[in-house]
Each structure stands twice: as C-alpha cells, then as structure tokens.
Amino acid sequence: NDILEIELGKELKPNERMSLDIKYNVKIPNSIGRFGYGENTINVTNWFPIACVNDERGWNLKSYETIGDPFYSETSDFHVKLLIPNKYKIAHTGKLIDDKHDNKKMLYEIEAENVRDFAFILSSKFDVNKVDSKGVAINTYNLNKKLSKKATEVAKDSINIFSELFGKYPYKEFSVVASDFFIGGMEY
C-alpha cells in the first residue's frame, strides 16, 4: 500500500490550515521509468508525498499505477533548492531563481506556481538550447546533438501553433527533455 493516513487529533475545518513536516529518504532506483536512472538520465519525478484529493466524491485513495496517467492531485506552489554535482545539467519544472556553484557542486533555487507536480531530470550529456517565442522561454534538453537544433525549432513551432489554436500558453517557460524513459513520453 502506498497511502499514508495521518490522524490529526482534531478536525480540520474548511479553509483552515495546518503544517505537517515529513522527513524521509529517497533512493533512486536503476529504472528507465518515471522515477529512476538509466544510461543517459536520472529521472526524478513522482518522488515526494502528496496529499490525496478530497472532492465532491470524498477522498480519492487510488494507489499509484505503473501504466497510464495515474495521478490526481491539486495544484501547488513549489520553492525548491537542489544541490547537485557540477557534472550534471538539470531540466526542471518552473523557473530558475538563483544558482550558485563551487568546484564540485551547484545549488539551484527554483520556483513553480500553480502546477500539479515538481519534477527534474539530470544528465551530463544534455545539449541545451534556449529560445523565446511569444513571451515564453523555450528550453530543450537533447541527448543527440545532431537533432538538437531541430528539436528546438519543433518546440518553438508547437508553442506558436497551440497558442494560436487554443490560447496563450499559461506559463513563462516550456521545456522539452529527452530522457531514458521506456514509455516514450510524459508531461510534467
């Protein structure tokens, strides 16, 4: 079972808030799925506890599924600090606020507002490209340098076409990331 039930000791009323600190350790497995490492990337997604959604049907207590889109979560704001070895480039949810480095490590400070999840992927092999289109910073993280420029053009064209058809992209950044991921793709 992957559901943690916590007894609060008192009823939490509508719009009332509380804080809960959970300390835990995460060991990243050798896996080319959503969470794990492969030959080229370290995929750190779905890696922290989230609250079950309480909607008009009550608490949604569905467990994690390995196939399909098994996630149902509220949106949140994230303020994350990550300390990683300098050899890696990082693709992440949200906007980079600050970065500091020494000879061995890099400290990233990242914010993401009104998103359903916070994910990041590390690789020492990324070829990173950045362009801007319609006020959106477009980032591509490629494992094949020969295809890197084309991947960036396709990402830019996607933002332009979808913005015309469906309305302005609601975030300031859009990233496309190549990874060791057996399913073929995932949106975060």
Q: Where is each model-derived feature located?
A:
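Solvent-exposed beta-hairpin/edge-strand motifs
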Residues: 1, 44-45, 83, 87
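A surface-exposed beta-strand-loop module
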Residues: 1-40
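Short structured motifs
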Residues: 3-8, 62-67, 92-97
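Glycine/proline-rich low-complexity spacer/linker segments in large multi-domain proteins
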Residues: 24-78, 129
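Hydrophobic helix-coil surface modules that form long, contiguous segments used
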Residues: 54-55, 69-188
